[in-house]
Curated annotation (Swiss-Prot):
The keyword Cytoplasm applies. This is Ribose-5-phosphate isomerase. It comes from the Eukaryota. One of its GO terms (biological process) is pentose-phosphate shunt, non-oxidative branch. InterPro entries: NagB/RpiA_transferase-like, Ribose5P_isomerase_type_A. GO terms for cellular component: cytoplasm. It is an enzyme of class 5 (isomerase). Its main location: cytoplasm.
């Protein structure tokens, strides 16, 4: 581990490296690489593996950032549209928040639709993050709201529907500084961030279904299918949650 990294980055790195060490198959054929600051270290670790473990492996990205990570690491890039449920050996991805039952909020980087496709197609979904992303209930740490990808023509209706459902706030996510208008996803859609307060672990799946059924919603940032999560701690240890 590099002592030059700030403590938070060291925490991310140890979690990512251990996750790869314990879950990257020796005979991997297709592997998903997600988005976010911790996944940088997933790509770093995979790139350091013996070439015989990666030379025949196809790596699937969840967006522009992870595509660059794969290419910069000299790994073989594939497209998710060639694969279906169970075709990926494993997928590694970050999370904005994770509860004790491995429910996650994802989509802070606006790649939630692609992230969910990759996660759904993987036989094992591994979450990597730092200690700040672990909580007793979703909405405790990540208070920006559940990211929801929405068809542009329906965003006002979806916001109104979310508030009727009980969202304390529901707002259209603005673009980055210097960009006029809202953020646009890789699919040409908008992101609405809806905050429902603390969501008890047993209520996450039901809330996801209710939001997903709203006309105009493409996908929600509620993930309920993780198999294991690794959290790098400030003291250099790693905490894990498994099913």
């Amino acid at each position: 581990m590099s002592s030059e990294l700030p403590p938070l980055e060291q925490a991310k790195r140890i979690a990512a490296h251990q996750a790869v060490e314990q879950h990257y198959p020796k005979d991997a054929k297709v592997v998903g690489i997600g988005s976010g600051s911790t996944v940088v270290y997933v790509a770093e670790k995979i790139a350091s593996l013996p070439k015989e473990l990666t030379k025949d492996t196809v790596f699937i990205s969840t967006g522009f950032q992870s595509k660059q990570l794969i290419q910069n690491a000299g790994l073989r890039l594939g497209c998710i549209d060639q694969y279906s449920n169970g075709d990926l050996d494993v997928a590694f991805d970050g999370a904005d928040e994770t509860d004790p039952q491995l429910n996650c909020i994802k989509g802070g980087g606006a790649c939630l639709f692609q992230e969910k496709i990759v996660a759904e197609c993987a036989r094992k979904f591994v979450v990597v993050a730092d200690y700040r992303k672990q909580s007793k209930a979703l909405g405790t740490v990540w208070i920006q709201g559940i990211p929801i990808e929405v068809v542009p023509d329906a965003y006002n209706k979806v916001i109104a529907d979310l508030k009727k459902m009980g969202a304390q706030s529901a707002v259209l996510r603005p673009g980055s500084p210097g960009k006029a208008g809202p953020i646009i996803t890789d699919n040409g859609n908008f992101i609405v961030d809806a905050y429902f307060g603390e969501i008890q672990p047993d209520a996450v799946k039901d809330l996801h279904i209710k939001i997903k059924l709203l006309l105009g919603v493409v996908e929600t940032g509620l993930f309920t299918n993780a198999d294991v999560a690794y959290f790098g701690n400030a003291d250099g240890t790693i905490s894990t949650i498994t099913k």
